[in-house]
Amino acid sequence: YFNLIAKHINVQEDLDIVFMKWDQDIPKTKNKCILFVTSDEHHKYHEKFTNHPNVILTFRNYLPEQHHPKVKALPLGYLQGFEHEDINFNDRKYDYSFSGTLPDAPCDATRHALKFSLERLDTLEQQYEKFVLFYEGWAKGLTMPEYADVMYNSRVALCPKGYTSSETFRYFEAARAGCVIISEPKPDVWFYKDAPHIEIKDWLKLPSVLPSILKDKDLLNHHHELTKKWWEEKCSPESVGAYITRELNKLKFRFRYEGYE
């Protein structure tokens, strides 16, 4: 995902692009650089990204609450291997799906509330085609090709927040697959503006919410189209590369205006 973004950054100056995890040291670079920083799910503020003389801008996942003009939000995107041919929305096998970990209680009440609600849905008279898998331990569930197949075959994707952050890769993978997304509120950052998900604040209410969504074909198709549009305009590698280009050009203009060039 990040390599594809980098291909769509269009600036005239020599500029190095560094991919790194938040806890790594910033490497020496020949030219001024921008950073792509990942993996800090605690949204912490790190001065090294704002004080380093060679760093022009930092684009990072999990934007901290403490804002800084040199630090910009970056979508999580999708994990390597999440690839699948597109499947017509009305031809998909599953009405809804979820595949993810289930930690020991009470570590994550959200995930247990989701599991309880999905079990309640199984008792309803109306039965749905679904794929639901809870498992213990990181990377103990589906392979990435299997997971992509489930997501691209789902009309509705249930996307609860991550354990330490309200953000999750699942949300963006569901968006890339054109699913109707049900999720909690998201942070106030640029790419979540006009995000197309159907908001839920309490997963225990899912049994009363999901059936009405699945019955409304017009609503499903509308949100499917909104999701595809949002992905293409806000989170696809092409659109994120264009966003980074705009931010770099704004910075270049400001430097010239203030007499730094």
Residue ranges and their predicted role:
Residues 118-121, 207, 217:
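Generic N-terminal initiation segments characterized by hydrophobic and/or small/turn-forming residues
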Residues 1-199, 233-259:
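Nucleotide-sugar donor-binding catalytic core of glycosyltransferases
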Residues 219-233:
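A short, well-ordered alpha-helix in the C-terminal region of glycosyltransferases
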Residues 200, 206, 227, 257-261:
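Hydrophobic transmembrane alpha-helix bundles
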Residues 205-212, 222, 226, 239-247:
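Alpha-helical elements of Rossmann-like donor-binding domains used by nucleotide-donor carbohydrate transfer enzymes
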